[in-house]
Amino acid sequence: MPQKLHIDVETYSSIDITKSGAYKYCESIDFEILILCYAFDKGPIKTIDLLQGETIPQSFLDALIDPEIEKHAHNANFERNCFRAIGYNVPIKQWFCSAIKSGYCGLPLGLGAVSEALNLQDEGKLATGRALIRFFSCPVKPTKKNEQRERNFPIHDLEKWEEYKRYCQNDVKAERKIGEILKNYDIPKFERENYILDQEINDRGILIDLDFADNALALDEVNSEIVGQEMKQITKLENPNSPKQLKDWLGNQMQTEVKSLAKDEIPKLIEEAGPGVVSDVLNLRLRASKTSIKKYVAMQKCVCYDGRAHGLFQFYGASRTGRWAGRLIQLQNLPQNHLAELDKVRSVFKDGKYEEVSALYPDVSSTLSQLIRTAFIAEPEHTFAVADFSAIEARVIAWLADETWRMDVFNSHGKIYEASASQMFGIPIEKIDKSTEEGSAIRSKGKVA
């Protein structure tokens, strides 16, 4: 009996996987597997051309659901979702991902990048794939030249189609070769369990209050228009949102070259300009450039039929450290909120019109940014519990380094950031008060340390 089943698929869906993720991509009504390539152990790679009428062999399906046979794929989450979409919900524990194995070994996650790093050459991922995926696996824009069709099929370029099948075959070859090269570097049981947990978390997803997200974006659209009109009225620019036009205007007003309108540069420009029309425009620019608002757009794009966003974490996504990385909405990078009456504010922004909202909370974009966390909700009759380990990195590093004085801090008052800053700058710890501007600035330096 074979021990391993190596799999790769090429698929079609009208959903943009880069913006919506694999879960929503696979649940699209037009999702289908176009090509299936697979191999048992070191056996020959078999290619099934599903789009041209071939069917998946029963021997493959039997192996797919056999708990004794390991399923191997590069980025196995995708293949697992693909087969679940066509009725084969293979348990996570049966899947093994060569991308995760690569990440564990300090290599890139992408199949092409790993192929290059390991010098797989002819056995590596083919460079032709990106263009072929765009041609066969994505919708195309109807034109007179393509006879107004919205999708390409093999009949539209048989040579490319054969090349696409070879590309899929090579992905199986590359995945299998990576496994052979890294066979002596077993993922520890603890990390394997973490991977399975990661997949369970991604499968479960998180419930999104879409009504709230939709209204938030509607409010932001009105706010952006109003702020833009205010900037236009003051500056007389044709397009005050254009960085070049605005930099030129600011340069003329301030009699100096303005090189950047980056978010962290604007407060410096405001301080340099002082009170007046320039500061007014720069403050409007800050209000109009809250990039975090785009997270509401990401919610809309990736939420699935069950009202949840799935696939928000990438196991071993950070190079070198192997930490989890965020995907799609980027849950690990959410704006803080400092709103005193959070529930009340949220209620107003969920149901209110712009006139009502802006009258109560004039800085609409800032408030919307602070409300992003509240778009994630519990399902009915459940509680959404939010927990965080206090200064967890500082605690673990102190313990690993056997740094006694830091562990003593945690065993007493626990103010590690203040204690670090005290040692750095020779300031008594009791004088570092985070409620004051100076104390907060000093404490933040201790936090970095």
Residue ranges and their predicted role:
Residues 104, 387, 408-412:
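Conserved, non-catalytic sequence blocks in retroelement Pol enzymes and Pol-derived host proteins
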Residues 1-11, 15-17, 35, 117, ...:
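Conserved "right-hand" nucleotidyltransferase catalytic core of DNA-directed polymerases
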Residues 9-15, 24-26, 75:
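Ser/Thr-glycine-rich phosphate-binding loops at phosphate-binding pockets of nucleotides
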Residues 23, 30-32, 393-427:
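Metal-dependent catalytic core segments for phosphate chemistry
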